[in-house]
């Protein structure tokens, strides 16, 4: 099966998952949201989205084995032991698939079918073979609040990401450079996709529209750049890096991989992903976004300037932080990153020395 056929299947899967998430978002119930054992929030949309993508890939790629690396599994769902929740997810999945003409007469789905579809996401990935990488609802907190979230699906072949699709149901269709991500409600909802050597495109999620090719910003003066970061406890090194570059604007806060999508079409120039302490980064949080940016002419590296390595299993092999920007800005940005890390390490050494004395 060609990559074009796989891309078509991925677009269909992600579009239907976005349709399900929109239905949940229209009337989010208290019982639709709970906390997992790691205290992170999860919703019926997370599980429904994963089940839809899993089932669509299975149906569309009938002659291809589907290895899926995804965020959720049914273990957490079984822990809450709520038949009503599982029944709601099952109905959401059934209704979503039935809304597509090609699936309207498919065999009825049971709750066990949905649980099995969710658990198809237990693959470990790795450097050999083909693996789909799914973020079923990226930015669950944003989804719950009615803010930005994304559904990202990528294909890994022999350790390399070769295509990616991302639905951003709350992102304005028109480019929002300098517009603080504001738009008319009827113009909201984007589907981004890209594949190796073919560029990145965007089209409407809600209506039939011709795809438009997108490219990263042409700004080459770091002081004029704007940057994205997640909603979380402020990370001091972000401010240090921005200061070294001469960036004066406050960061644009966006949940999820939507930052990759916005950067790919020039809504901003820099996305930094550093944490206070080094921690594992799940591949599903970056796989689709990385190829969407790179095919739009951008660069995605770790803090040392190395390309992100998605071949090591469920977690990225990377150095210290993630840097997403344009080719024009990357050299100066990496210099600022190296200087900032060095200063941070020196400060930590001083603090440790003072404690000893």
Curated annotation (Swiss-Prot):
Its EC number is 3.1.3.7, 3.1.3.57. Adenosine 3',5'-bisphosphate binds at residues 140, 256, 259, 273. It comes from the Eukaryota. The active site is at 46 (proton acceptor), 140 (proton acceptor). The keyword rRNA-binding does not apply. Mg(2+) 1 binds at residues 71, 135, 137. Pathway: Signal transduction; phosphatidylinositol signaling pathway. Keywords: Hydrolase, Magnesium, Metal-binding, Multifunctional enzyme. It is an enzyme of class 3 (hydrolase). Mg(2+) 3 binds at residue 71. Mg(2+) 2 binds at residue 135. InterPro entries: DPNP, Inositol_monoP_superfamily, Inositol_monophosphatase-like. It catalyses: 3'-phosphoadenylyl sulfate + H2O = adenosine 5'-phosphosulfate + phosphate; adenosine 3',5'-bisphosphate + H2O = AMP + phosphate; adenosine 2',5'-bisphosphate + H2O = AMP + phosphate; 1D-myo-inositol 1,4-bisphosphate + H2O = 1D-myo-inositol 4-phosphate + phosphate. One of its GO terms (molecular function) is inositol-1,4-bisphosphate 1-phosphatase activity. SUPFAM superfamilies: Carbohydrate phosphatase. Pfam families: Inositol_P. AMP binds at residues 256, 259, 273. Its cofactor is Mg(2+). GO terms for biological process: sulfur compound metabolic process. Phosphatase that converts adenosine 3'-phosphate 5'-phosphosulfate (PAPS) to adenosine 5'-phosphosulfate (APS) and 3'(2')-phosphoadenosine 5'-phosphate (PAP) to AMP. Is also able to hydrolyze inositol 1,4-bisphosphate and inositol 1,3,4-trisphosphate. Belongs to the inositol monophosphatase superfamily. This is Probable 3'(2'),5'-bisphosphate nucleotidase 3. It comes from Arabidopsis thaliana.
């Amino acid at each position: 099966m060609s990559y074009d056929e796989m891309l078509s299947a991925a677009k269909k899967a992600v579009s239907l998952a976005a349709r399900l998430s929109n239905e949940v978002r229209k009337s989010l119930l208290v019982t639709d949201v709970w906390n997992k054992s790691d205290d992170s929030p999860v919703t019926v949309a997370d599980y429904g989205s994963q089940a839809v993508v899993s089932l669509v890939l299975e149906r569309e790629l009938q002659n291809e084995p589907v290895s899926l690396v995804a965020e959720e599994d049914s273990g957490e769902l079984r822990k809450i032991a709520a038949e009503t929740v599982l029944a709601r997810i099952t109905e959401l999945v059934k209704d979503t698939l039935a809304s597509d003409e090609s699936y309207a007469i498919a065999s009825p789905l049971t709750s066990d079918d949905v649980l099995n579809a969710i658990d198809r996401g237990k693959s470990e990935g790795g450097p050999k073979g083909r693996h789909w990488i799914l973020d079923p609802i990226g930015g669950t907190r944003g989804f719950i609040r009615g803010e930005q979230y994304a559904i990202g699906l990528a294909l890994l072949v022999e350790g390399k990401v070769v295509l990616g699709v991302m639905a951003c149901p709350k992102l304005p269709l028109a480019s929002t450079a300098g517009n603080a991500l504001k738009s008319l409600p009827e113009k909201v909802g984007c589907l981004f996709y890209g594949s190796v050597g073919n560029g990145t495109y965007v089209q409407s999620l809600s209506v039939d529209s011709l795809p438009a090719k997108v490219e990263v910003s042409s700004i080459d003066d770091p002081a004029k750049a704007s940057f994205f970061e997640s909603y979380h406890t402020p990370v001091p090194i972000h401010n240090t890096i921005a200061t070294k570059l001469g960036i004066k604007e406050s960061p644009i806060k966006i949940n999820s991989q939507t930052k990759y999508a916005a950067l790919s079409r020039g809504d901003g120039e820099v996305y930094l992903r550093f944490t206070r302490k080094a921690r594992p980064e799940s591949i599903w949080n970056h796989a689709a976004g990385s190829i969407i940016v790179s095919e739009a002419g951008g660069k995605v590296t770790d803090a040392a300037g190395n390309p992100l390595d998605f071949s090591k299993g469920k977690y990225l092999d990377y150095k210290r932080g993630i840097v997403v920007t344009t080719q024009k800005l990357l050299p100066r940005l990496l210099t600022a990153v190296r200087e900032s890390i060095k200063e941070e390490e020196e400060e930590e050494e001083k603090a440790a020395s003072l404690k000893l004395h």
